[in-house]
Amino acid sequence: MSCRVCDLCTSGREYDCNDRLIWGFQTGPLWGGFCQYGHLPEVNVAKIPDNVSFDDAAAVSMVGMTAWHMLVGRAKIRPGQTVLIMGGTSGVGMVGIQIAKLYGCDVIATAGNKEKMDKCLELGADHVVNHREADWYKKVREITKKQGVDVVFEHIGKSTFAQEVSLLKNGGTLVATGATTGYDSTIDLRYLFFKGTNLLGSTQGTKAELEQVIYWTSKGKIKPLIGQILPFSDMVKGHVMMANGDIMGKIVTTPQKL
């Protein structure tokens, strides 16, 4: 949620608002957002079309807005570009693949096992590699005939960041929104100035971007990947699954009567 009145908000950059709040993280006296009901301003919600289920809307909204802002708002992808989507079966990665294809890009996705690699292809990726293999970045080079990629969609962090930077074409763009394997990474700075590399940060997005995601979901162009639907009583199970990497896509929780 943003303040909606500062210069950043009124210019359409509410994601940069200095007073923005993340529901369940900075709002209220307790940490966490697991609750049956939430009370927030109307301006901070978007209407769900009749043909989009509550489960699908829950699964696609935050990750979809984040992915749209990364690829369209920040990296400004164009038809014909080659886009590398790291972690293609993660919540944000699954939507990233579909947005890049929606924009006419050639998509290379990464995943950590055969099942997840197959799912990336099902989501629309043109190529997929296993980022748990030591030479994964060499396979990306082979796919691109040593030309590299135009855009890297990054949220893995330390374990792959340096290789991702090395895979960019001259003038290429890496846009990052997370660091699940660690925040401190060492890179060869020569890739930045000799290749004119763009390193961009990104977080969340705008209401207009969320509405774009919901619109394309209603048209069937973006299909949420739901790994599990769990009741609140199984919340701990969901956290264990995420920690162990035993999930593809999103975990959706359903409220229960007390």
Predicted segments, located by residue:
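Glycine-rich phosphate/adenylate-binding loop and adjacent beta-alpha elements
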Residues: 1-45
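Mid-domain Rossmann-like dinucleotide-binding core that forms the NAD(H)/NADP(H) cofactor-binding site
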Residues: 52-134
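Glycine-rich helix-loop-beta junction characteristic of Rossmann-like nucleotide cofactor-binding loops
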Residues: 73-78, 144-145, 166
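Phosphate-coordination loops involved in phosphoryl transfer and adenosine-cofactor binding
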Residues: 79-81, 149, 171
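C-terminal capping/lid region of NAD(P)-dependent oxidoreductase domains
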Residues: 83, 146, 221-228, 237-258
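Glycine-rich phosphate-binding loop and adjacent beta-alpha segment
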Residues: 103, 111-114, 120, 155-225, ...
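Short amphipathic alpha-helix with an adjacent loop that forms part of the alpha/beta core around
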Residues: 135-146
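Periplasmic-binding protein-like
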Residues: 149-155
